[in-house]
Amino acid sequence: MLDALAALLKALLYVGILSCAGAVFAQATLRPPFDSSHILSQLIRRGCVLTICAALASAGCLFIRLGAEFDIATLSAVFLSNTGAAMCLQIAGAGLLLFGASDASTRATQLSNALLVTASFAFNGHAAADGLTAGIVAFLHVSLAAWWFSSLWVLRDACARAGSTAVAATGWPS
């Protein structure tokens, strides 16, 4: 039961990370239409909240799976391990994105905060166990996947706003 809960929380964490970090990457690189700024800010805010909640819940679930003892070994396994480092990066990056300024003059700061969130994949999971190179590849892979994920939301929003004639001109079925 706890394994299923941990998998669900991990999936929610991934959705949150793809949303919040990807929206920042898309906003910085795509020059989206002015109408799409609302969807990007929603993706950032909701993704940040989901990332923070899922990261904390995942840490709590891991604590319970390890026996829920408040001893040094259990707390070290949760907070002083690669899992704890990844959780700190996720919460710090998402918190800075959520509570930081979000105008055009702070774009570089937003990018660095989003990179903090995706850098957590270099410290946790199979890639971290394989070494530094695999961790960097995982970090880049997740960053690009997040950009792609949010870029599709921007494209979907732009197509919905353009109307059926503009979408029909692209050749996509409506």
Regions found by a protein language model. Give the residues of each.
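Polytopic transmembrane helical bundles with strong interfacial aromatic enrichment
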Residues: 1-174
